[in-house]
Design a protein with these regions (language model features):
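Cytochrome P450 heme-thiolate monooxygenase catalytic core
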Residues: 2-13, 63, 73-83, 98, ...
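Cytochrome P450 catalytic-core helices
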Residues: 264-283, 287-289, 402-418
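N-terminal membrane-proximal hinge/A-helix region immediately C-terminal to the signal-anchor transmembrane segment
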Residues: 1-89, 94-101, 116, 120-128, ...
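Conserved cytochrome P450 K-helix/beta-meander segment immediately N-terminal to the heme-binding cysteine loop
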Residues: 352-379
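Cytochrome P450 I-helix active-site segment
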Residues: 8-18, 119, 123, 171-175, ...
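Cytochrome P450 proximal C-terminal region
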Residues: 3-6, 10, 34-37, 126, ...
Length: 450
């Protein structure tokens, strides 16, 4: 890695010989990044598995994610053999022209008017969850939100399949996800080649998902009538040259969507319940909204997100304080200069941390305070666009963002209309930065029927 002549490295904290900042980062990922940015400014030089820059200037973030995104790809760890083993050649691992071609193919399936068709699926899954809740019961709301969001994703992907098939699919997805978390936590480059029990379980789950998907593809290709589930849309999708995807490519996309389709919004909902429990005024505003929007309508049924701006603002503020995706990592493919003036040598890792940016007092006054009004239209327009990016931006913007918002608002409104959730005693809630940001030991809450 060669530094352009006449340029100096950005400032950063002192590093240990050989291991750099890795021990400090692994010991307290969120705190280390926040402290580094607070002490050393908008471009911080770190040593975490090589030269790394932590960026906290919105213009620099826009540069990496949008303006020069072709120069900043995901890490080889994700795009290499380890990532490909888990996601295949799906959208999350594709790069360059391959990514653009695949995104253009998939985007129509996620247009707002298309995903609106899944409002009934969301309502049915939310109602099924709420029928299992009872006055006075204590639940782990994190488990509940993960479960309902995963059920919705499975139904949206494979809506034509039987409940038994959907249950097998969901179980396999969970097994694969646990193994992925183990791989991403490990610093050992060869751990995915060890013949462990979890590796065998992963392999079985991988084949189960592909088997279910391949059988579903065959039925949909042979069917005389059209279906509107996502798998059917993938089967019908065409590239610009008129060609469709192979069965293998569709399987790769299903594996990608089966994980990415539920975790972000499940974590956002979990943290939203936690935050609402600590703010009676915001809780009352949500109740007023959901009661008014549903006046004269059945307790169960489809929720209209347009009638629930407070629910959307609560979720947005939840993702500000506790962003499900807490860190993006990119790698510079060529030498570059950021808008802030910092020179970036080829091969430099770039850290963009939602945890750090979303709590920056320059853009969010009293940043640790829960205040959904930050996401009223006038407040949004008053701050830089790239001070807040829970779903990413540019060509890597989460393709399922609209689906996530529809799920989140619908589940929050449906549950808030029927129950009040309060924190169960005897807990210390600590955010754990894993693949997503989650409560370390779950989140137990007591239900009170409204």
């Amino acid at each position: 890695m060669n530094r352009p002549a006449g340029t100096a490295e950005p400032p950063g904290p002192p590093a240990l010989p050989l291991v750099g900042h890795a021990p400090a980062f692994l010991r307290d990922k969120l705190g280390f990044l926040a402290r580094s940015a607070a002490e050393y400014g908008d471009v911080v030089r770190l040593r975490i598995g090589g030269s790394t820059y932590l960026l906290t200037d919105p213009d620099d973030i826009k540069h990496v994610l949008v303006s020069k995104s072709d120069n900043y790809e995901k890490t080889p760890r994700l795009n290499g053999l380890r990532g490909r083993r888990f996601f295949g050649s799906g959208l999350v691992t594709a790069v360059g022209a391959e990514h653009l071609r695949q995104r253009r193919m998939l985007q129509p399936a996620f247009h707002r008017e298309v995903i609106a068709r899944f409002a009934g699926v969301i309502a049915e899954c939310a109602d099924a969850m709420l029928r299992g809740w009872s006055d006075g019961a204590v639940i782990d709301v994190h488990d509940e939100m993960l479960d309902v969001a995963q059920r919705i994703t499975a139904r949206a992907l494979l809506g034509e399949e039987s409940d038994a098939v959907l249950d097998r699919f969901r179980a396999a997805v969970l097994t694969r996800r646990r193994y992925q978390e183990q791989l991403l936590r490990s610093i050992l480059p060869f751990i995915d080649r060890l013949p462990t029990r979890t590796a065998r379980e992963y392999s079985q789950a991988h084949h189960e998902i592909d088997r279910i998907t391949t059988e579903g593809i065959a039925r949909r290709r042979a069917a005389a009538t059209r279906s509107d589930d996502l798998l059917s849309m993938l089967v019908r999708a065409r590239y610009d040259d008129g060609q469709g995807m192979s069965d293998d490519q569709i399987c790769d996309e299903v594996r990608t969507l089966s994980v990415g389709g539920y975790e972000t919004i499940a974590e956002a909902l979990t943290w939203a319940w936690y935050l609402l429990a600590g703010d009676p005024d915001v809780e009352a505003a949500v109740w007023k909204e959901v009661d008014g929007a549903a006046a004269g309508e059945p307790v169960t049924g489809v929720v209209d997100p347009a009638k629930h701006p407070w629910c959307r603002m609560v979720l947005a503020e939840s993702m500000r304080l506790y962003p499900p995706t807490w860190l993006f990592v990119r790698v510079a493919q060529r030498d570059d200069v950021l808008p802030s003036g910092a020179a970036v040598p080829s091969g430099t890792k770039i850290y963009l941390s939602q945890w750090v940016m979303h709590r920056d007092a320059r853009y969010f006054a009293d940043p640790d305070r829960f205040d959904p009004r930050r996401f009223a239209a006038d407040a949004i327009s008053a701050r830089p666009r790239f001070a807040y990016f829970p779903f990413g931006a540019g060509r890597r913007l989460c393709i399922g963002e609209e689906f996530a918002w529809m799920q989140g608002v619908s589940i929050l409104a449906s549950a808030a209309r029927r129950f009040r959730l309060t924190l169960a005693p005897g807990q210390t809630i600590v955010p754990e930065p894993n693949v997503t940001l989650r409560p370390r030991k779950g989140l137990r809450m007591q239900l009170a029927r409204r």
